[in-house]
Curated annotation (Swiss-Prot):
Highest classification ranks of the organism: Eukaryota, Metazoa, Chordata, Craniata, Vertebrata
Presequence positions on this chain: 1-26
Localization: Mitochondrion
Main location group: mitochondrion
Entry's Gene Ontology cellular component terms: mitochondrial large ribosomal subunit
This protein's name: Large ribosomal subunit protein mL38
InterPro entries named among the record's database cross-references: PEBP (IPR008914), PEBP-like_sf (IPR036610), PEBP_euk (IPR035810)
The gene coding this protein: MRPL38
Length: 380
């Protein structure tokens, strides 16, 4: 009978000791101003003014809530949003669109749909078909560039490519890899493409005015084997006339992605720049073929900084890639080097200092501090 009483007393002492110790060590400083209700005399509650009406109490409560205070309320503490650092926009200016014209076109489209009896009947019978190509074209024309910008910020492309500067990809960039004779593997905004699917030169299309010049590059953000802040240039086409990609100058020939085994998922980005004039890229030209990784070391930020007066980023498309069997062929046959293999080494598990008398610990407690892997549970 004494055991429960003794444990209860010991538990109470521990709780009292922990509370008192924390109160002493808290080092509470005096408040910066008067505390709430500190001006009320609590010695004689009968003399306090009574509201006698809920409306009077509500008006008084609203006045008190709107009055400035030196402390922060719960909502102010957890609902306060820190203003993000304003980033530099290096992209093309937004198109000038009349809001009135947009509203008129939208109302006209709604009137036409309501007047179309066949569409109404198909929608009621659930047999209506939606043209997805038209929906995607409308999305790319309106809110698609801003969605792509948010995805690029989520994947850290602007942070690693342009050191935090941002731009809205206003020119839709369509990239697709040919897989077999009839199939295509498209590149969207972060979908996964295997190195086998990206072995050949992709098909790139975009809308451009006649007489304009463009630059297209493909870079790997996470694949450099020696420098952590460098990239590998996989493809660079310059002075592209209009949207005729095949007629552009091949400044750097295409090299398939080669994410090393065990290095995880890599990001590869297609960037489209609009040139204001013809540019001489002879300093950035690579030999053809170019299978020396040192010659493909690249930094997008330095490249753009060098030609920022004559070109502007306009389009963006990126995908993710991880190792497969074709990477071994690229290292052995194309790059003529041994294939690097990485392995994640987990840190040793942390254990607190061993106690001489492990009170209320399981029988496996000693296994944490044994050099051998032979368990003690079931031996004794």
């Amino acid at each position: 009978m004494a055991a429960p009483w003794w444990r209860a007393a010991l538990c109470g002492c521990r709780r009292w000791r922990g509370f008192s110790t924390s109160a002493v060590l808290g080092r509470r400083t005096p408040p910066l101003g008067p505390m709430p209700n500190s001006d009320i005399d609590l010695s004689n509650l009968e003399r306090l003014e009574k509201y006698r009406s809920f409306d009077r109490y509500r008006r008084r409560a609203e006045q008190e809530a709107q009055a400035p205070h030196w402390w922060r309320t719960y909502r102010e503490h957890f609902g306060e949003k820190t203003d993000p650092e304003e980033k530099i926009d290096i992209g093309l200016p937004p198109p000038k669109v009349s809001r009135t014209q947009q509203l008129l076109e939208r109302k006209q489209a709604i009137r036409e749909l309501r007047a179309n009896v066949e569409e109404e009947r198909a929608a009621r019978l659930r047999t209506a078909s939606v043209p997805l190509d038209a929906v995607r074209a409308e999305w790319e024309r309106t809110c698609g560039p801003y969605h792509k910008q948010r995805l690029a910020e989520y994947y850290g492309l602007y942070r690693d490519l342009f050191h935090g500067a941002t731009f809205v990809p206003r020119v839709p960039l369509h990239v697709a890899y040919a897989v077999g004779e009839d199939d295509l593997m498209p590149v969207y905004c972060g979908n996964e493409v295997t190195p086998t699917e990206a072995a050949q030169v992709p098909e790139v299309t975009y809308e451009a005015e006649e007489g304009s010049l463009w630059t297209l590059l493909l870079t790997s953000l996470d694949g450099h084997l020696l420098e952590p802040d460098a990239e590998y240039l996989h493809w660079l086409l310059t002075n592209i006339p209009g949207n005729r990609v095949a007629e552009g100058q091949v400044t750097c020939p295409y090299l398939p992605p080669f994410p090393a085994r065990g290095s995880g998922i890599h990001r590869l980005a297609f960037l489209l720049f609009k040139q204001d004039q013809p540019i001489d890229f002879s300093e950035d030209a690579r030999p053809s073929p170019c299978y020396q990784l040192a010659q493909r070391t690249f930094r997008t930020f330095d490249f753009y900084k060098k030609y920022q007066e004559a070109m502007t980023p306009a389009g963006l498309s990126f995908f993710q890639c991880r190792w497969d069997d074709s990477v071994t062929y690229i290292f052995h046959q194309l790059l003529d080097m041994r294939e690097p293999v990485f392995e994640f080494v987990r840190p040793p598990p942390y254990h607190p200092k061993q106690k001489r008398f492990p009170h209320r610990q399981p029988l496996r407690y000693l296994d944490r501090y044994r050099d051998s892997h032979e368990p003690t549970y079931g031996i004794y």
